[in-house]
Amino acid sequence: MDKENAGSSGVGGDSFILFEAECSDTDSESPAQGESTDEDLLDNATAVPGNHLELFQTQEKEAGERQISILKRKLCLSPCSADSEVEQLKSWACCHKYHTSEANPVVRRRLFERGDPGGANTPVNHEADNFSPSGLQVQSGENRWSQEKGKGGVSPVPSSAEPNMAACIQKLFKTLYIASHGEITRVFQSNKTVNHQWVILAYGVSEVLYSASFDLFGKQCNCLQTSRKVHEKGSISVYRCMFNVAKSRDTVQKLMTTILNVTAGNLLLQPPKIRGLGPALFWFKLTLSPATLTHGTTPEWIQQATNVASNTGEAAKFDLGTMVQWAYDHGFTEESKIAYEYALCAGSDCNAKAFLASTSQARLVKDCCTMVRHYLRAEVQALTMSGYIKRRCDQTAGSGSWLSIMNLLKYHGIEHIQFVNALKPWLKGIPKYNCITIVGPPNSGKSLLCNSLIAFLGGKVLTFANHHSHFWLAPLADCRVALIDDATTACWRYFDTHLRNVLDGYPFGIDRKHNTAVQMKAPPLLVTSNIDVHAEEKYFYSHSRVKPFYFKEPCPASDNGEPMFSITDADWKHFFERLWGRLDLSDQEDEVDDDECSQRTVTCSARNANDIN
C-alpha cells in the first residue's frame, strides 16, 4: 500500500499507528514528557537509618570546642610556648588547687595533647577550674609542686608567687589548727630585725626531716615546741622556737632551709604575740596534744597568761603613788630613765604591768618625774649642809684616801690649812666667802679638782653659753653647790654687772620655765678660769667677793696620757670624814634629836599600815 492511499483504506488500524509514529517529532524530545511523575513521591521500600543525629552531635561538639577555645584564649598555651609564660602560669595552677570544690573530683589534663604524628595540637575539652599548664606536674601529697627530675625536693617557687604561696600556707594552717596565723603572731616588716622567739610554719616537710629537726633545734633553743599535721593538700609543721641568741628572719630562714630541705617560699616566719590571752592559750593547748614535742621550760608570758591565780581576780589597777615611791627610792629623776627601768619591772611588779597596759604612759611618766623632783627638792632644802654632806658620804660606796687631794694641792704650792680654812665658810655660805676661784694655765688640774667635788656633793654645772636665756640660772634652785667651769672675760663681765649678789651669797631671784620666779639664797659657787680677777682693775668690785687659789704648774700625765692625779668620790668621802671637826660641821647625833622629821623615810604612796617599808 502506498502512502497516498493509506488513510482511505478501511482495513485495520495497524498501519495507521505505524504511519503516525513515523510522522512524530524528532528523537531528541524526552520520551517521558507525556508520562506522569506522581509515583516518584512515594517510596514503599524498607527505610534505612541515616547519620543525621551523629552529624548534629559532631557539629555541636565542634561549636562547643570553639567556644571553650575563645573562653580560654588568655590561658591556653601550647607545649611550644615560651618557658617564661609557663612559669608565670605555674604559680596560678599551684595556688588554684586550694580553691577547687571538694565535691568535684580534681581532674588534671594537658590543655594540648599530641595528636597525629604530624604534630597537630588537638584541644581537649575539660573543666576550666581544673586547668593545669603543660609541663607542670601536679601531685597529691606532701611535695605537690615537685618536678620529675627532683628527688624528693620541693621546686623553687617564683618570686611573684610568694604572696599566693603564703596565703595558701595560712589557709591550710587555719584548716588544720583552727586558729589563724595572724592571731598568734605579730608582723616584723624588716628581715634584719632580731628577736629571740620565732614562730615558723613549714609546708611539705617530710616526716623523717621533721623528727630529726627537733633534735637539731634543741641544741640551739632554750625552749622549743613543734607540731605536725597532715592534710590531703599537704602537711604543715609548726615550730615555736626561743633561740639562745637573738636571730633575724634571714638567719632563721637559712637555718630552716638547710635543716628541713625546703625552699624559702615554703616557710612563714614571724615572732609570736606575747601579749593577750588567746595566743598563750593556743600554745598551752597545743602542748596537751600527744603529737606535740616540747623542749625546755615554758616561756614566762605563757605561764602568766595561763596562771589561774593571776586571771581569776580583777585586773590590777595602776597606782601612781607606787610608781613615784619606786622612782624616789632609786633616785631616778629623768623621764626616759623612769620609763625604761619601770617597764623592765613589769615581769615581777603588778603595778608596772598595769603601767604598760595604760594608754597614758607618757603622761604618767611626766607626772611621776615631776613628783619625784618635788620630793627630792624639798628633802634637800630641809637638810643642813652638815646633814647633806653626811648623807652624800653614806651614799658613796668604797673607801678612798684624802691624800690624793692633798697631794694635788701640795703640787701647786697651796697650804692644806689655807684650803681648809677657805672651804669652811664656803660650805656655810657666809657672804663675801661664797665663791672660790681656781686660777691657772691650761692642763693644770683646775677642772679635775672642782668637777670631782661637785660630783661628790651632787651639785649643778652652769654653762655661760646659755646666758642669753632667762632660765640659764634655773638649776641653782635644785642644788646645794654649783660650778662654772672655764669662765672667760665675758663671763666675768656679766657677773660683775648683773650677779654680784650671787658672788656674795645673798638672796636673788631666779626665773624658771613654766613656773613663777623664785627668790632664794645663792648656793656656794666654784669657778675655774684662766683669768685672774684680782689682777684686773676693771673687776675691782669683785675682788672682795672671790677667794682665789692659783694652780701654776701643768698637771703631769702618764705615758698613756692619763693624769697622774686621780680624785674619786671615795677620796672626798674620806676627806670630809677626816676633817669633819676642822670644817666645823655639826654633829649628826644632835641633829637627829633636834629634827627627827628630816631623818624619817619619805612615804610617797598610800601604803597600808601593815606594809613593810
From Swiss-Prot:
It catalyses: Couples ATP hydrolysis with the unwinding of duplex DNA by translocating in the 3'-5' direction; ATP + H2O = ADP + phosphate + H(+). ATP-dependent DNA 3'-5' helicase required for initiation of viral DNA replication. It forms a complex with the viral E2 protein. The E1-E2 complex binds to the replication origin which contains binding sites for both proteins. During the initial step, a dimer of E1 interacts with a dimer of protein E2 leading to a complex that binds the viral origin of replication with high specificity. Then, a second dimer of E1 displaces the E2 dimer in an ATP-dependent manner to form the E1 tetramer. It is found in: Host nucleus. Residues 23-43, 114-159 are annotated as: Disordered. It is an enzyme of class 5 (isomerase). Its EC number is 5.6.2.4. It holds the Pfam family PPV_E1_DBD. Can form hexamers. Interacts with E2 protein; this interaction increases E1 DNA binding specificity. Interacts with host DNA polymerase subunit POLA2. Interacts with host single stranded DNA-binding protein RPA1. Interacts with host TOP1; this interaction stimulates the enzymatic activity of TOP1. Keywords: ATP-binding, DNA replication, DNA-binding, Early protein, Helicase, Host nucleus, Hydrolase, Isomerase, Isopeptide bond, Nucleotide-binding, Phosphoprotein, Ubl conjugation. This is Replication protein E1. Residues 400-564 form the SF3 helicase domain. ATP binds at residues 440-447. The gene is E1. HAMAP family: PPV_E1 (MF_04000). Residues 131-144 have a biased composition (Polar residues). InterPro entries: Helicase_SF3_DNA-vir, P-loop_NTPase, PPV_DNA_helicase_E1_C, PPV_DNA_helicase_E1_N, PPV_E1_DBD, PPV_E1_DBD_sf, Rep_E1_papillomaV, Znf_lg_T-Ag_D1_dom_sf. It comes from Odocoileus virginianus papillomavirus 1. GO terms for biological process: DNA replication.
